[in-house]
Amino acid sequence: AAMDWWTTESGTRVLAGRDLLSGGTWLAINTAGEVSAVTNVREGAPETGRISRGELPLRALTDSREHLERYLLDTADQFSGFNLVQLTTADGWYFSNRDAHPGRQIHRGVYGLSNHLLQTPWPKLLRLRQAAGDTIAAAGRDAATLHNELIPLLQDSTPAPDHMLPDTGVGLETERFLSSPFIVGSDYGTRATTVVTVSASGEIE
């Protein structure tokens, strides 16, 4: 379902899209302006997780960080590979069940996250992180300008050169297909482009 305000089973009010099969989501914002998101980790092998990763952004906006980290450490092997990011107006936190040292604080700055660990230097991540950082710096506090200029960057369907492609075990043709920020395909592709800004006072756009 499209992004909208709804109430989770635990009673948390969130702005999020919704997987109508599992009930989870990939990106969520609560009324306090806290943001959470999950991405899959590309591993080149069938996924074996027993619990849907879509529950994680919702849990990240409900549980305390301490309880969330304990839950993730206890259940890490029950999920297929994932990256979870939780952001508040004060700080951020990142957890991946494929990280050698899962659970780390994120400090103020510009970061990139795709379908591997945080800051993994894939071509599209490097390109987007630089462009997004420049755009944010130039836009200042004008959220409307920022949204309008970030969306075309995220919708770039230009593939990376072959010599820069990572090897994630899916073969050259698939690596090439997956190398653009916005993926266009008949059976697989990017479904949505979302830009969320939260002001220091908690105003969400």
Locations of the language-model features?
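N-terminal nucleophile
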Residues: 1-205
